Design a protein with these regions (language model features):
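Membrane-proximal, lumen/periplasm-facing interface regions of secretory-pathway glyco-
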Residues: 1-2, 337-392, 410-411
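Hydrophobic/aromatic-rich transmembrane helices and adjacent perimembrane loops
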Residues: 5, 96-99, 132-137, 141, ...
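Transmembrane-helix signature of polytopic, membrane-embedded enzymes
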Residues: 43-44, 60-84, 115
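Hydrophobic, aromatic-rich transmembrane alpha-helices
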Residues: 55, 60-61, 226-276
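Membrane-interface transmembrane helices that cradle and orient dolichyl/undecaprenyl
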Residues: 65, 106-122
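Transmembrane alpha-helix segments characteristic
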Residues: 74-80, 124-129, 145-146, 170, ...
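Signature aromatic-anchored transmembrane alpha helix within multi-pass, membrane-resident enzymes
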Residues: 120-127, 143-147, 163-170, 314, ...
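Extracytoplasmic
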Residues: 394-449, 462-486, 493-494
Length: 506
């Protein structure tokens, strides 16, 4: 919501070198700004990402309903919602639900095109692919997978069909490419830095952002095994906010898809076309996911491959349906798997209800909060000390203070009377230390001229940057806190010491 906030404040979509994320395509962020401006509340953005997620679920369900029984449709929806991180996406002002909806639409259109033909469907696929990339760069895997699907389906017409689909996709993405080129010097900012360059960026930040060289291949033989079994490993090890996979996709969404192969001969003639299409779209995206995970430390994160979710949901639901037609003897595999699936979904639903009941977001989002459930109390429940710390900045440092964040990338709730400099790449410390060769004391004292205070996310610094296995530059990061405390004094901290506000020593 940082860019929508700035967009509403200035009325202009300009470059912000202090935060590279604002250089990404901003289709959904503009919709957030439109909703917030229309209703006068930033919580109105919830209508956008909630609506996008609902549209995606309806598209998955509607596609399956055309080719399979109704209960198959409902199972696909349940498998998606069984992932804790997925349903949390409905509650967050982020772009993943839009990517999911566009991916579901692309799969639906591809299924229709493969069964009925028609150049108009190619135009629609290009439109959806271009929109998806204009929402999030990683949706480029969807565009590539659609191209592969067109090639496999009609190889003799691939040039003609490819030109139609790719031409439409590029035309739809063109405004964002031009914006990147004009404002940032890079049509795909901040990627491809070696080719295009880009303001506020350099080779070190490019390597650090993608965690180049820290992929699964760097883990030796065990990493190769994890790479081959990536969907299963991401399911087993994926937790919300985790380091390597960073997503809870649910127990069965991806693993259950294997059953469609085991029970292929038991699918009906109506079910096979959608299963083939889902598999055809999924395989190239899986290959790209594995390639990213092999070479990059963040490439294996499930949150980056949201376009695979509609295909996985359809294949898993169809595979489960095929199991119902397996022989019951000598062992009723279908009964066993059904019990396990039901148990997992019920447990997930219970956890969801508990979380929603505890957070109680409805009244706040709709502007109907109570004295016991105000906006401030809701934000404290959902963001913890982060919101409290930011609200203290003007009281502790004074109006007009310039605050540099350390190891804290989020600054949306920064008071209007304070200028906040978020640590978007968490490299306010590391970048000058590693790339400029500056001494620790020199870095801190160099802040004196343009910084009045520092907001230090000490809990994240200590638990993640100093202790988390696999996080690089632990020794260099460990130099920060002592250097900070030599020149600045603690003015405020929350009860748990998670966030601290520092000011200069006299």
């Amino acid at each position: 919501m940082l860019l929508p906030k700035r967009l509403l404040q200035t009325g202009q979509l300009v470059a912000y070198p202090d935060n590279h994320y604002t250089g990404f395509p901003q289709t959904v962020e503009i919709m957030f700004a439109w909703a917030a401006g229309l209703f006068g509340r930033d919580t109105s953005a919830a209508l956008v990402h909630y609506g996008a997620g609902l549209l995606g679920l309806v598209t998955v369900a509607g596609t399956l309903r055309r080719y399979a029984e109704t209960h198959v449709m409902w199972l696909a929806v349940a498998l998606l919602l069984g992932g804790g991180s997925f349903w949390l996406g409905f509650t967050r002002e982020y772009v993943d639900m839009a990517v999911f909806a566009l991916s579901a639409g692309a799969l639906a259109v591809l299924t229709v095109w493969r069964t009925s033909g028609g150049r108009a469907w190619l135009v629609v696929m290009g439109l959806l692919a271009g929109l998806a990339v204009g929402v999030k760069y990683t949706a480029g895997m969807l565009a590539i997978a659609l191209g592969v699907a067109v090639l496999v389906t009609q190889p003799r017409r691939v040039v003609r069909h490819g030109l139609v689909m790719a031409g439409v996709a590029l035309l739809v993405y063109l405004p964002w490419g031009l914006r990147g080129l004009v404002q940032y010097g890079n049509p795909f900012y901040p990627f491809f830095y070696g080719v295009f360059g880009g303001i506020g960026w350099d080779a070190a930040r490019a390597a650090g952002f993608s965690s180049s060289g820290d992929g699964l291949l760097a883990q030796g033989p065990l990493g190769v095994v994890r790479l081959v079994l990536l969907p299963f490993v991401a399911t087993a090890a994926g937790t919300e906010g985790g380091v390597r996979y960073s997503f809870d996709a649910g127990v069965w969404l991806m693993p259950l898809a294997v059953t469609v192969l085991l029970g292929w001969d038991r699918l009906t003639d109506e079910e096979r076309p959608v299963a083939k299409t889902a598999g055809l779209l999924l395989l190239p995206m899986l290959a790209l996911w594995m390639a990213g995970g092999a070479l990059s430390g963040i490439g294996a994160q499930t949150r980056l491959v949201i376009p695979v979710f509609p295909a996985f949901a359809m294949l898993s639901a169809l595979g489960f349906e095929s199991m119902s037609r397996w022989p019951r003897r000598p062992m009723n595999v279908y009964f066993i798997v059904r019990v396990l699936v039901i148990f997992a979904l019920v447990a997930s639903a219970f956890g969801t209800l508990v979380t929603v009941a505890n957070n109680n977001p409805g009244g706040v989002i709709l502007g109907a909060g109570t004295p016991q459930n105000t906006r401030d109390s809701y934000l404290f429940r959902t963001t913890g000390a982060h919101y409290v710390a930011l609200q203290q900045l003007d009281d502790v440092l004074g109006d007009g203070a310039r605050v540099r964040f350390a190891y804290e990338p989020k600054a949306y709730y920064c008071p209007a009377t304070v200028y906040c400099d978020p640590d978007a790449l968490t490299d306010h410390w590391l970048h000058p230390l590693l790339t400029e060769g500056r001494a620790p004391d020199e870095i801190i004292t160099g802040w004196r001229d343009d910084v009045d205070g520092v907001l230090f996310f000490r809990q994240g610094y200590e638990q993640f940057f100093l202790r988390e296995p696999g996080v690089p530059f632990k020794e260099e990061n460990a130099l920060f806190a002592p250097a900070l405390e030599r020149y600045m004094e603690l003015l405020w901290e929350d009860d748990a010491g998670a966030y601290q506000i520092y000011g200069w020593r006299e």
